[in-house]
């Protein structure tokens, strides 16, 4: 019998097993029959290239010298970073075009929009209508470039971000693209943003849904109930153990954003 729910979303191409956010990671994740979708992180360089890279700088993931590794990615050109490889691998920091080309069209893609380096960007929700318009305007140049690449493929695309401005800009640029607010512990804000942007999903952290014993919290139950009533999915991040996967499946989540397919037991 085939597996139905929860779906398994390969976090950065299964970061625990592969050099994260690289072309090789995409190929490995896509070749695993447990994978339903792949999550990747999009960033801007100083010369307006869209790369796939998680961190603000290169210090954690590359052996770049301090003059480069301590500089924010958005202040570096693609030529300045393209020669460095991820971790102990030979995999370079890829362009979004390269990563998407490595993922089969049949595989879903969760594109997380990271901070593009513009000043005045508010993390999380924005207070009022005027501020939301301004936030969307600040995000728009980067979002347009990322979506120009992503929507040129046939992938089932879901755009997520911790920044409301990114969601607003996505809605303005491509109204038909599915979006999902990423939230930390403020799940109520996640519900508000999901309603505001008619989101297809909400992406909360595990500890916003489960207590230390693995039992669904009252806030988690409420979030799941509201989301499912509105026909929205809940995709939880970041799953690192089979115990977490089982508890989240019992809670009724729709997707597991996982660092390895090995953490997803067959009985979920």
What label would you give each PLM region?
Residues 11, 29, 41, 81, ...:
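Conserved, mostly hydrophobic/aromatic
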Residues 4-9, 152-156, 170-181, 220-237:
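Short beta-strand/loop segments at the ligand-binding rim of alpha/beta enzyme cores
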